[in-house]
Amino acid sequence: MNKTNIGIFLCLFFVTASYFYIFSNNEKVGSAELEEGQPIEIVLVPAQISEQGLLGKNIFEHKCQSCHGINAAGRYEIGPPLVHKIYEPSHHSDQSFYRAVALGVKAHHWPFGNMAAVEGLTQGDIKAIISYVRELQRENGIL
């Protein structure tokens, strides 16, 4: 092995070791003071919400809030925030919300486990929920 290869190997080793050291702890930075169920994000609520958004808020509060938190802020150790860059339309389109409700979701971004399908919602209900979530996202600079 020449000096260049040894240098590359050592750099890769230290980067990999640092990654595992930093991310091996399951707790997020700043989460030590959170207790189970507390909001994960601070969510600003728009001064005015559309009629469709208000309908969605009402449905969200009955069907989604127990996991996703008040105003979709998430609940520590329970469910993810939907007012988060991960859920912007370029990464999670409106269609992904329809699919999540109908089929459930295998955990892939967060450590909360899988989401079960949600029963008893019409396509119109889901559309209203999406409207509410997108309005919250817009107010929080995500859209």
PLM region descriptions:
Residues G56, E61-I70, I129-V133:
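The canonical Cys-X-X-Cys-His
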Residues Y76-V83, L103-L136, G141-L143:
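Axial heme c-ligation environment in periplasmic c-type cytochrome domains
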Residues Q52, S93, F97, D125-I126:
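Stable alpha-helical elements in mature extracytoplasmic
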